Amino acid sequence: MAMRELNADSCSSPQMGAMWETSGSVKENSSQSKKYSTKIENLGPESACRHFWSFRYHEATGPLETISQLQKLCHQWLRPEIHSKEQILEMLVLEQFLSILPKETQNWVQKHHPQNVKQALVLVEFLQREPDGTKNEVTAHELGKEAVLLGGTAVAPGFKWKPAEPQPMGVFQKEYWNTYRVLQEQLGWNTHKETQPVYERAVHDQQMLALSEQKRIKHWKMASKLILPESLSLLTFEDVAVYFSEEEWQLLNPLEKTLYNDVMQDIYETVISLGLKLKNDTGNDHPISVSTSEIQTSGCEVSKKTRMKIAQKTMGRENPGDTHSVQKWHRAFPRKKRKKPATCKQELPKLMDLHGKGPTGEKPFKCQECGKSFRVSSDLIKHHRIHTGEKPYKCQQCDRRFRWSSDLNKHFMTHQGIKPYRCSWCGKSFSHNTNLHTHQRIHTGEKPFKCDECGKRFIQNSHLIKHQRTHTGEQPYTCSLCKRNFSRRSSLLRHQKLHRRREACLVSPN
């Protein structure tokens, strides 16, 4: 009901123009329905939105035309032919969110042209925590950076970027910087490697130009070298650590320092939990590991899940630098329960899978039979069963054997009478999900398998194979008594019944 009260001002707000390009405009009021119908044909999204919510019953000649006009306006507004369901939902939620904001907040947020709900949320939260004197100035770090961390784009049309000014470090800031530097030294990280900032890599190429004023933060290097215990080989993982020089650290505001503090704390916690070792330039080994949620392959963007997690933790903290020593980071993490340390054998496959077994995605394990390659040896062992015919998994009830453990588990359900998959049309139950999907094609009429010879279609692939034998003349089923061949197993079974009947007649005294 609140959407019905959406006024014309909110429908014509700038965020609509940010999402879709406006094409054409018309006068809103018309007394004749035919003229009105002609006018709405070429409406742009903003005008269509405005007309949709302001449309009245008397503007049409009856209920049928009223519904028709509303459908046209809604279609021109939402553009379902070019936008996904998620985009349409995003647009509706954004419009409603802006329409229910207090008037002062609504005007200020609309002035900055949020492109999506996440950017609007950042703007509103920024407005709530900032004093009145600073509401009109929005810095790149306060909004653009947070928008990226929440999964949105860093730059929106209408944003006025204001670079943060360098501020002299006080006693607390010096202590905070020293803590940051100590952690870098503890982990053996180099603070002078140059690379592109993570948040810049998450921005569209066309929007990168708007971040030219942010070049003062360009020493983000995400790399660590891990030496795995025993005889395991060296693995290099990029996109793990964040680096700043002392001069760059002075330019960061408390919000940013809190962000980097949280990132390093998470890295250090998970580094210790795996019990691996890091090799630094001095040759000393320090216990270290890598958070699997933070690892990204080289050249990829920061994942949306990771960005949101970091942003939520950062925005929820008021006082940056609550933890002032590496030792505290290692000993206690009050905000979340520490995970049970995992062994290297448990975590290595995950790390190798995330990183593609090295920088090039190498697949060193090759099948000698067919030449197919695999990333880990266990996959090669499983694949080799196809060539050898090995079926190591045996059913204890019927002695049937299976190549994969998953197949044995599915088969076991048939003995137990478990049929968890139920058809919503007829109520029939099935033990396997694939059987349910095949059955539902009877109700939907779907026939995805087509014969290339005659064009006839079938519900199941097995039916297509049987049909194709009528074209090829193949007869794979042979009678063991008379050596007659058949194209279908059912035909062979009927034929074998004739043999049994003849034998019964010969044995019978009558």
Swiss-Prot record:
<keyword id="KW-0862">Zinc</keyword>
<keyword id="KW-0863">Zinc-finger</keyword>
<dbReference type="InterPro" id="IPR001909">
    <property type="entry name" value="KRAB"/>
</dbReference>
<dbReference type="GO" id="GO:0006357">
    <property type="term" value="P:regulation of transcription by RNA polymerase II"/>
</dbReference>
<dbReference type="Pfam" id="PF02023">
    <property type="entry name" value="SCAN"/>
</dbReference>
<keyword id="KW-0479">Metal-binding</keyword>
<dbReference type="Pfam" id="PF00096">
    <property type="entry name" value="zf-C2H2"/>
</dbReference>
<feature type="compositionally biased region" description="Polar residues">
    <location>
        <begin position="22"/>
        <end position="35"/>
    </location>
</feature>
<keyword id="KW-0238">DNA-binding</keyword>
<feature type="zinc finger region" description="C2H2-type 2">
    <location>
        <begin position="393"/>
        <end position="415"/>
    </location>
</feature>
<feature type="zinc finger region" description="C2H2-type 1">
    <location>
        <begin position="365"/>
        <end position="387"/>
    </location>
</feature>
<comment type="similarity">
    <text>Belongs to the krueppel C2H2-type zinc-finger protein family.</text>
</comment>
<protein>
    <recommendedName>
        <fullName>Zinc finger protein 75D</fullName>
    </recommendedName>
</protein>
<feature type="zinc finger region" description="C2H2-type 5">
    <location>
        <begin position="477"/>
        <end position="499"/>
    </location>
</feature>
<keyword id="KW-0677">Repeat</keyword>
<keyword id="KW-0805">Transcription regulation</keyword>
<dbReference type="GO" id="GO:0000981">
    <property type="term" value="F:DNA-binding transcription factor activity, RNA polymerase II-specific"/>
</dbReference>
<comment type="function">
    <text>May be involved in transcriptional regulation.</text>
</comment>
<dbReference type="InterPro" id="IPR036236">
    <property type="entry name" value="Znf_C2H2_sf"/>
</dbReference>
<keyword id="KW-0804">Transcription</keyword>
<feature type="zinc finger region" description="C2H2-type 4">
    <location>
        <begin position="449"/>
        <end position="471"/>
    </location>
</feature>
<dbReference type="Pfam" id="PF01352">
    <property type="entry name" value="KRAB"/>
</dbReference>
<feature type="compositionally biased region" description="Basic residues">
    <location>
        <begin position="327"/>
        <end position="342"/>
    </location>
</feature>
<dbReference type="GO" id="GO:0008270">
    <property type="term" value="F:zinc ion binding"/>
</dbReference>
<feature type="region of interest" description="Disordered">
    <location>
        <begin position="313"/>
        <end position="342"/>
    </location>
</feature>
<keyword id="KW-0539">Nucleus</keyword>
<feature type="domain" description="KRAB">
    <location>
        <begin position="235"/>
        <end position="318"/>
    </location>
</feature>
<feature type="region of interest" description="Disordered">
    <location>
        <begin position="1"/>
        <end position="35"/>
    </location>
</feature>
<dbReference type="InterPro" id="IPR003309">
    <property type="entry name" value="SCAN_dom"/>
</dbReference>
<feature type="domain" description="SCAN box">
    <location>
        <begin position="49"/>
        <end position="131"/>
    </location>
</feature>
<feature type="zinc finger region" description="C2H2-type 3">
    <location>
        <begin position="421"/>
        <end position="443"/>
    </location>
</feature>
<dbReference type="InterPro" id="IPR036051">
    <property type="entry name" value="KRAB_dom_sf"/>
</dbReference>
<dbReference type="GO" id="GO:0000978">
    <property type="term" value="F:RNA polymerase II cis-regulatory region sequence-specific DNA binding"/>
</dbReference>
<dbReference type="InterPro" id="IPR013087">
    <property type="entry name" value="Znf_C2H2_type"/>
</dbReference>
<dbReference type="InterPro" id="IPR038269">
    <property type="entry name" value="SCAN_sf"/>
</dbReference>
<dbReference type="GO" id="GO:0005634">
    <property type="term" value="C:nucleus"/>
</dbReference>
